[in-house]
Amino acid sequence: MDDIVQFDFPTDSPKIIKVIGVGGGGGNAVNHMYREGIHDVTFVLCNTDNQALKESPVPVKLQLGRSITEGLGAGNRPERAREAAEESSEEIKSLLNDGTKMVFITAGMGGGTGTGAAPVIARIAKEMDILTVGIVTIPFIFEGEKKIIQALDGVERIAQHVDALLVINNERLREIYSDLTFMNAFGKADDTLSIAAKSIAEIITMRGTVNLDFADVKTILKDGGVAIMSTGFGEGESRVTKAIDDALHSPLLNNNDIFNAKKVMLNVSFCESSEL
């Protein structure tokens, strides 16, 4: 069985942001992001499942706990995945010890590897003084009560080790997009994770007319706790109002009231012909 510790970092320009997909759900989301593209970030997969790593197009990969799981996955056991991540802690540190200033850790909570390993990776990143943002999903109801309970425990654990945590409730997506098929439901979850990571990362990596940089993002997110974010789009007449209304009704908000937020960061994208 081949061991995977593959750090093929691009050499064209330094990238201070990493997006790490942990486990099956996180890996699917990062595969999707990699294909869609996010400007100037490095994508990474961490998994106990050697086969899933081999099948991914993402070039930077780390197999967790090779002696514990022997590349066969965590068997839906978060405690086994935690042990695997701890065994690979030095490799995780090496992965991050290259000038990384911000890391997004994305995982589907409720299974084994994402639920167990993501909090360990988050803890290591935070201990290295890297701005650490968790973006995780809670399962659909049809995935079963055990998985949901396991997911909530995982959310509680990762919340202790991140600067900011975005929790996306998959069941909320199903309520909003009621016509989704079984497979499209998981695809919509991947889309939502991708939008969340892309929206924050490209505030830093894409220069704007009124520029926001890493320091601005760090001020908002550092030790921010549970966070919510949203995106909205508008076109034609009253497009600004339409975009705001769209953002306020995004599934990313999970019915949360944004008006009690302690910090807010607003980023607006517009065409050159837009009037003030």
Whereabouts are the PLM-identified features?
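Tubulin/FtsZ superfamily GTPase core signature
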Residues: 1-276
